[in-house]
Amino acid sequence: MPAAGSNEPDGVLSYQRPDEEAVVDQGGTSTILNIHYEKEELEGHRTLYVGVRMPLGRQSHRHHRTHGQKHRRRGRGKGASQGEEGLEALAHDTPSQRVQFILGTEEDEEHVPHELFTELDEICMKEGEDAEWKETARWLKFEEDVEDGGERWSKPYVATLSLHSLFELRSCLINGTVLLDMHANSIEEISDLILDQQELSSDLNDSMRVKVREALLKKHHHQNEKKRNNLIPIVRSFAEVGKKQSDPHLMDKHGQTVSPQSVPTTNLEVKNGVNCEHSPVDLSKVDLHFMKKIPTGAEASNVLVGEVDILDRPIVAFVRLSPAVLLSGLTEVPIPTRFLFILLGPVGKGQQYHEIGRSMATIMTDEIFHDVAYKAKERDDLLAGIDEFLDQVTVLPPGEWDPSIRIEPPKNVPSQEKRKMPGVPNGNVCHIEQEPHGGHSGPELQRTGRLFGGLVLDIKRKAPWYWSDYRDALSLQCLASFLFLYCACMSPVITFGGLLGEATEGRISAIESLFGASMTGIAYSLFAGQALTILGSTGPVLVFEKILFKFCKDYALSYLSLRACIGLWTAFLCIVLVATDASSLVCYITRFTEEAFASLICIIFIYEAIEKLIHLAETYPIHMHSQLDHLSLYYCRCTLPENPNNHTLQYWKDHNIVTAEVHWANLTVSECQEMHGEFMGSACGHHGPYTPDVLFWSCILFFTTFILSSTLKTFKTSRYFPTRVRSMVSDFAVFLTIFTMVIIDFLIGVPSPKLQVPSVFKPTRDDRGWIINPIGPNPWWTVIAAIIPALLCTILIFMDQQITAVIINRKEHKLKKGCGYHLDLLMVAIMLGVCSIMGLPWFVAATVLSITHVNSLKLESECSAPGEQPKFLGIREQRVTGLMIFVLMGCSVFMTAILKFIPMPVLYGVFLYMGVSSLQGIQFFDRLKLFGMPAKHQPDFIYLRHVPLRKVHLFTLIQLTCLVLLWVIKASPAAIVFPMMVLALVFVRKVMDLCFSKRELSWLDDLMPESKKKKLDDAKKKAKEEEEAEKMLEIGGDKFPLESRKLLSSPGKNISCRCDPSEINISDEMPKTTVWKALSMNSGNAKEKSLFN
C-alpha cells in the first residue's frame, strides 16, 4: 500500500537505458506499453502444440540480448500493419487485461512460478573496514526489517510503500537494463553480463566498470551470522535452544544426519531438490530455524541497492536467471536465485535507493506480479505488471496515517483470483460463483438404483485408503488424541451403564456397557467408512430401555429376550436401508438441522456436567450456617430408626440382625447405611453427616479442569516457547490437565468421589449369561410384535448416526479419503444385532465425542511464512485412535488400580470443556450473539454482507424455537419421540423456502436438493441463455477462439464497449501526473547531459 504521506525526496533519480537511447517520457507512456499482438498470436493463445519444442532463448552469453530492443519493436510494428484496426484497440488495453493475457500463456518447465524468498541487501561501509553487502530486510510473505540496533529482526508486518518510490521503480524498469532468461552460474558471470550491457551504451569506462564489479562482488553479511560469530556466547535463551532441538535434521545424499557442528562445510541439498556441487554451503552460517519456514521448491529474489562514490548516475538492472542458480553466500538461506534487481547510484541518496529496493521486494511478493515476473517475455510485460499493481493499491491519506506505524499481518489474506479473471463488456470483473457453505451433494449420496449399490461404491472408495489409515496414525498428535478421548469416553460409558443398571435392576449394567462399547468400537474402527466417528450411548436409547423394561415388568415378559428380538429387527431394517441407498436422503439434512442437533447435544453435555456437580451436594452435604464457636458441640451419630419401614424390617430379618444387640453409636457411616440406621445430631444432613471440604474441593477440581484444558489448548498461539513445544502442549492439553489434577487431588488428600470401574469380567447378575435367547420364556408372537418398536428404534438409530456423520463429513473439514454413509450404517446395524444377542447396550455415533475427535486431529501448515497464520490443511484421517480408545476401554477391567485415582469432578470438567469447545464454529451461536449488538460493533461475517439483518434474526429465531422444542421433548417423558422431532426439522427447513430467497439461504444455510422437474426446467433455461449469448457474440463479430474469449474477454474488443467515464487506464493516466512528468524531465536532462559529455 503506498502511503501518500511520505515526504518526496530532495531530487528525483535520473536513469539512462544502457542498451539504447534514453527514453524520454513526455506524457505518452502508453505508447511504450502498447502490446501489439498479432492475429496469429491471439488465435494461438492458450493452444497446446504437441511435439514442437521451441528454444527459450539464445544459448550464447556474449550475444545475450535484452527484450524490447529496437529491431524487435520494428518487427512488431511491421506485423501490426496487417491488422491495424484490431491492434489499435489492443493498444489501449488496461493493465489488468494485459496481465490476464500474460498469465494465460502456456507454462514451460523454466517459467513455472515458484514461491519466492526476497532479500534486500545494501552496501555498508564502516570506518577502517572494507565495504560489504549487509542484509537489511527480507520478505517471505510479509516484511521483516533488521532493527536499528542491528541485533534482531522486527516482527513481520504489512509493507507500506510511498507512491513516489513506486513511480521511481517503474521508471527504473523503463530506463534500466532488463535481462530475461539469463544463463549464468555465478555472481561473477551475472556481473559481467550486466556490465557488458552497460558498456554497449558507453556509460561505463574501464575504471568505473572495475569499481562497479568490485562493489557487486563484495562479501554478503547476513543477520543470522552475527550471533554465530560471537566467540563467547555467555547467555543463550531457552527459546534459541528450543529452536535447535525442533529443527528437522538435514540429510546428506547417503541419508546420514548432518549437523552444523559435525560438518562445517558441505554440499547442501537445497529444498527444491537441486544439488549444486559447485556451490558448497557452509551449514554453520545457515539459519536452520528460518530455513524450516521456506516452502519446498522456493526460489530467491535478491534486491541489491547502494551508493558507489565513482558513479554520477544510477545503474539499474533487472535479471531473471534461467535456470535458477544457487549462488553461494548471496542469500541468507541456501536456495537457488531466480531474480536479481540491482540499483547502484551516486552518494547522497541512500534512503531513496532503500525505498526503491523495498518497493521492488514488496511487489515481488504480490501474487499477480510474481506470476508476471516468471512469464514475462519483454520489458513491457513487467511494466504491465507494475501498472496492474498500481491499479489495485490503496492510498492512505497523509494527514490520517503515520507511515512509521507497522501494520500487523491479517489473520486471513483475501484471495487474488478476481485479479486474474477477465472483464466483461461493461467493464466489470466476472465474479466466480462462490460456494458459501459446503453441502452434501457429493457422489457418496447419489442413488445408484441397484441393490447395495451405494455400499459397493463405499467399499471401492475406501479400500485404496485402508492401509494408509494405519500409516497416517504415526504421529504424536494421534497419541494425544487417543489419551484424551479414552478418558473422555470412559466416564459416560460407565455412567450410562450405571443408569441402565438402575433402570433394569442390574440386567444390563457397567460391565456390560464397557464390554459392548469396546467390542462395537473396535469393529467399527476396523471396518467402518468414516472411522473418525466415535460411538457412544445416547439419551433416547436410555429412555427407550426404561420404557421397554417397565412394559416387560408389567406384562411379565422377559426383558432381555424381547429386547433381543427388537434389536434383531432393528438391525434387519437398517440393513434394508443400506440395501436401498436410503442414506442418500442425508442430502436433505442441511446446516439448519445439523446445527440445531449439534447445539442441543453440546448444551446437554454442559448442562449434565454442571448438574452432576450440583448432585454431589446430596452425597456430600455441607452445613451452610455453621457457628465457629459451637464446633465442639456438633456431632452426628448412628441410631436405631424410630419407625422402621417394611423394607428395613425385611432386611433385618433376612440377615438375622437383632437390633438390641447392635451398638449403633459405634457404627461407621457406611456400616450405618448398610444396616438401615438413622443419623441424628446437629451435624447431620438428610442422607448422612455433613462432609467437610469435599463439595468445595470438587468445585475447584471441576472449574480448574475446564480452565486449564481451555488454556493449554490455546497455548499453541501463545508467544512463549518454541513452536514444537507449543504444539505438543496444545495436543496433549486435556491429558496433561487430567494428569495434573489427579496428582494435585492425591497430594491434597480430600476424599473426592472417584471413577468406579468393575474389577471382575462377568455379567452383573448371576441369572443371565453372555448369550440371550430371542424367544426365551416369552410367547412366540412377541417375535413378530417386536417389529413395531423396532421401527421407532430404526428411526432413532438412523437419525443419530447419519446426522453425526454429516457433521463430521462437512466440506469445511477438508477430508480427502471420502465418506462411507452406507458402510457406516451397515457396521452399526451388524453390531447392534450382535449386542442384542449378547445382552449388551446399543451404541451409535456420539455427536460431541466425534466432533471432539475431529478437532483433536486438525492439521495445520508447518511451513508458514513469518507473520502468516498457519493454514488449516484438513484432518489426520486414520483408524488407529478410535481403535486404541476402545481396545484400552476393554482392558479397563484390569486397570482398576490406576483408574480409581481419577476424581469424577475432573471428568465432569472434561465434559464441560468438550461441550463448550464443540460449540465453537457453530454459526447458530455466532448469529445468536448479534441480538442486542449495535451494527457498528457486529463482526464482519460474510453472510451479513449479503443478507439483511432482519432476515438473519428471523432465521436465528426459527432455529432457536426448534432448539427449545427439542430440549423440552428431550427432557420430558416423551423423549422417545426425539428422533422424530429431529426428522421434523428437515420439513421445517423445507417450509423456510417460502420465507427466504434462494440467495439468502445459500449464505445462511445449505441449499436443499430440488425436484427432478425443477432441475430439468433450470437446465433448459440455462441452455437457452447460453444459446442467446452465443448469438450475441456472433452478431458482435468476435473472431477470437473460444479459449481466448474466456481468458481475455477479447482484448481490445472490450474497449469499444467501454463508455463508463469512471473507468480509467492507469497506464494512460499516470503520465499526466506531476510526479511522473518530473521523473520524465529529469530523465530527459540526463540524456542531454550524456550526449554532450
Curated annotation (Swiss-Prot):
> Where found in the cell?
Apical cell membrane; Basolateral cell membrane; Cytoplasmic vesicle, Secretory vesicle, Synaptic vesicle membrane
State if Transmembrane helix is listed as a keyword: yes
Mind listing the GO molecular function terms for this protein? bicarbonate transmembrane transporter activity; chloride transmembrane transporter activity; identical protein binding; sodium ion transmembrane transporter activity; sodium,bicarbonate:chloride antiporter activity; sodium:bicarbonate symporter activity; solute:inorganic anion antiporter activity; zinc ion binding
> Where would I find glycosylation on this chain?
N646
Q: Which InterPro entries match?
A: Band3_cytoplasmic_dom (IPR013769), HCO3_transpt-like_TM_dom (IPR011531), HCO3_transpt_euk (IPR003020), Na/HCO3_transpt (IPR003024), PTrfase/Anion_transptr (IPR016152)
Q: Which residues form a coiled coil?
A: 1010-1036
Q: Which UniProt keywords apply?
A: Anion exchange, Antiport, Cell membrane, Coiled coil, Cytoplasmic vesicle, Disulfide bond, Glycoprotein, Ion transport, Membrane, Sodium, Sodium transport, Synapse, Transmembrane, Transmembrane helix, Transport, Zinc
The residues forming the signal peptide are: none
Q: Bias category Basic residues: which stretches?
A: 59-77
State whether keyword Magnesium applies: no
- Tell me the residue ranges located in the Cytoplasmic compartment per UniProt: 500-523, 587-595, 709-731, 800-824, 903-904, 984-1093
The protein's predominant localisation is membrane
| GO terms (BP aspect) | basolateral protein secretion; bicarbonate transport; chloride transmembrane transport; modulation of chemical synaptic transmission; positive regulation of synaptic vesicle exocytosis; regulation of intracellular pH; regulation of membrane potential; sodium ion transmembrane transport
The entry's family comment says: Belongs to the anion exchanger (TC 2.A.31) family.
Task: Share what the entry says about its subunit structure, partners included.
Answer: Homodimer.
Q: Identify this protein by name.
A: Electroneutral sodium bicarbonate exchanger 1
At the highest ranks, the source species' classification is:
Eukaryota, Metazoa, Chordata, Craniata, Vertebrata
